[in-house]
Amino acid sequence: MSRFVITTTMALGLALSAGGSAQAADTKQLFDFYCAQCHGTAGDGKGINVTKDFATDPRNFTNAADMEKRSDDDIRSVIKDGGPSISKSPLMPPWGATLSAAEVDELLAYIRKLCKCKAK
């Protein structure tokens, strides 16, 4: 009986700890699919779709000094409503009809991890 309890407890613990990393992996997949094409897989603004013809460079999420100036509300708004929603580039598309509110919040948290910064 105690062997069963120990095995069950260990399995439950592993499952719960894997859930957090699964969510992190899912968020990375979201970022890679929707954001990395322009912002780069490292978030440095050097995505594979960026050309010299871009009117402006995509935001470098790893630049902590710049990203600290951006409020969470502004970043959330840009993800949902596109660049023009905060007077930024129209090349940044709106994802509000595609992503859930929870996914937008997950991407926001992921972006904050990339810059290792806090909102203003």
Q: Where are the regions that the model predicts?
A:
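Periplasmic/extracellular electron-transfer cofactor-ligation site
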Residues: 28-56, 81-90, 114-120
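Axial heme c-ligation environment in periplasmic c-type cytochrome domains
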Residues: 57-60, 65, 74, 78-105, ...
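Solvent-exposed, polar/charged alpha-helical surfaces in well-ordered, non-transmembrane soluble domains
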Residues: 28-29, 33, 73, 77, ...
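Bacterial N-terminal signal peptides
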Residues: 7-17
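Positively charged n-region of N-terminal signal peptides that target proteins for export
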Residues: 1-5
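Electrostatic cytochrome c docking/interface patches
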Residues: 15-30
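Short, solvent-exposed loop/helix junctions and linker helices
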Residues: 24, 68-70, 101
